[in-house]
């Protein structure tokens, strides 16, 4: 990094800053620079970010140039790709006026996502000192893709603002926004804000995203509709719904009651939410590497009432044909369709079952007290007898394959920072499975390697040892016992071909003890 700042009566303030070779795990910027030069009536500045072409990113050059004067400022941003094609060129001029600040978009033919747009020549956004906003702005291309932001004079309202987005293709922005997530879809949206003469704010929103995709997985067409309406009594009411493929999947309605000095000492809330066949498949796009695949949907209702800081929750959740598939183990977990009830903020599992291919389930019994989200109290018991944890043939994706049968008994009690876990697992004798140790640091090859080693005997006593911070696992007190029956065949392949491997045989007792004070 280079920083140079100079001041003098003759030349004023001059500054420059350069940062080279900024790198993180997923970010690589070759040059970041900023320069400022003072002139008699204004300060000129130019800045930018330069990234060269790399295997994980395309080259780009982003610049932000402009000037700042006593009563006026302007800035222009430009984006060039590796071929020096202009993806963005748009600016804004801000001017101080009596009673507020006026903003204008320049030029009248800006470039966005490599296309020319047209801005109305009389465009403005006026921010008044009294908080009111007046606007008349429209930016559209030949296909009527773009946005508009305008105010409507209304004698019955202090402010009446509308923001409209038309045919905005989200995926196109990946071409001009480095490191943007892999998301696609077409947005059509309209937001309306009204402030009445008595200062009440009203907001309505209609939003549609068609052909939504994330990480290459199609999520369908989505729509959001919401209304915010305050009342004279102080109540703030909201009503909304979310639809997927023209079917309602989430609805919400509720009110927030701010505290009053006499009758009410604390803020209150009264809200209801309902899930209508909410599809779990949408979670698959957010799971890295398709490590797990969800299917099925959720139905249920939830009501929150009482103090806003610690509301009481009541309702139930129904899992409808919910399955979780883990490709690396060819494991399919099927969840019980029995409703899970929530009463007075206590989530109760009444012998809730999880099945695999086998006949005997994994059972969860107990409850989770969610009255205080920061200190949720858990009291759970988990049991399984002759549970078929694994029954799969080897595939290209397999990390583990074969057959694995277990008896499992465990209890989990306490809060997240004071958790007590006790239990045992017995691997039954009819188990025969193989685990593939990928990217293993262990090797049995090259036995003659390092027969001769060259050592640098230079003095290293002055070198300070790097102290790594201790990794605390919180307030967990765990004692788990593992028993491997006679007859269990457990093989660990050191590579994918299985040319090097280890066998594990009968073991009377292996204990894993983790105390609260343990740090690594």
Task: Identify the meaning behind each predicted range.
Residues 1-192, 196-301, 309-409, 415-520:
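Interface amphipathic segments
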């Amino acid at each position: 990094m280079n920083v140079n700042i100079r001041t003098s009566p003759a030349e004023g303030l001059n500054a420059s800053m350069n940062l080279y070779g900024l790198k993180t795990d997923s970010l690589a910027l070759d040059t970041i620079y900023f320069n400022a030069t003072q002139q008699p009536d204004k300060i000129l500045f130019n800045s930018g970010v330069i990234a060269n072409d790399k295997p994980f990113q395309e080259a780009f050059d982003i610049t932000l140039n402009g000037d700042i004067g006593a009563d006026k400022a302007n800035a222009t941003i430009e984006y060039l790709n590796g071929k020096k094609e202009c993806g963005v060129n748009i600016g804004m001029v801000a001017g101080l006026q009596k009673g507020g600040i006026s903003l204008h978009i320049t030029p009248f033919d800006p470039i966005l996502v490599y296309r020319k747009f047209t801005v109305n020549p009389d465009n403005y956004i006026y921010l008044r000192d009294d908080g009111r906003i007046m606007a008349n702005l429209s930016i559209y291309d030949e296909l009527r893709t773009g946005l508009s932001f305008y105010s409507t004079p209304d004698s019955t309202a202090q402010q009446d603002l509308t923001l409209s987005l038309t045919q905005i293709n989200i995926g196109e922005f990946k071409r001009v926004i480095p490191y943007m997530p892999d998301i696609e879809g077409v947005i059509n949206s309209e937001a309306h804000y009204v402030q009445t003469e008595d200062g009440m704010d009203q907001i309505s929103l209609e939003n549609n995203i068609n052909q939504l995709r994330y990480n290459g997985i199609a999520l369908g067409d989505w729509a959001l509709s919401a209304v915010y309406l305050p009342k004279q009594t102080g109540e703030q009411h909201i009503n909304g719904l979310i639809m997927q493929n023209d079917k309602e999947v989430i609805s919400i309605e509720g009110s927030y009651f701010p505290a009053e000095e006499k009758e009410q000492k604390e803020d209150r809330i009264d809200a209801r939410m309902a899930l209508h066949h909410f599809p779990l498949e949408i979670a698959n796009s957010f799971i890295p590497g398709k490590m797990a695949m969800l299917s099925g949907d959720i139905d249920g209702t939830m009501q929150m009432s009482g103090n806003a800081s610690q509301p009481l929750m009541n309702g139930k959740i129904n899992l409808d044909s919910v399955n979780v598939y883990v490709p690396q183990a060819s494991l399919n977990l099927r969840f019980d369709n029995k409703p899970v009830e929530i009463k007075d903020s206590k989530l109760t599992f009444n012998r809730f079952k999880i099945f695999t291919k086998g006949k005997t389930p994994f059972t969860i019994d107990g409850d989770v007290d969610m009255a205080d989200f920061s200190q949720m109290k858990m009291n759970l018991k988990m049991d399984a007898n002759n549970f078929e944890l694994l029954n799969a043939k080897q595939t290209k994706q397999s990390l583990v394959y074969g057959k694995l049968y277990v008896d499992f008994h465990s209890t989990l009690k306490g809060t997240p920072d004071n958790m007590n876990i006790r239990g045992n697992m017995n691997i039954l004798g009819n188990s025969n499975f193989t685990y593939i140790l990928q990217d293993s640091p262990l090797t049995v090859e090259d036995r003659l390697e390092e027969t001769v080693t060259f050592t640098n005997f230079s003095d290293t006593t002055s070198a300070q040892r790097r102290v790594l911070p201790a990794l605390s696992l919180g307030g967990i007190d765990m004692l788990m016992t593992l028993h491997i029956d006679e007859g269990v065949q457990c093989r660990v392949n050191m590579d994918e071909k299985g040319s090097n491997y280890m066998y594990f045989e009968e073991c009377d007792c292996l204990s894993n003890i983790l105390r609260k004070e343990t740090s690594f």
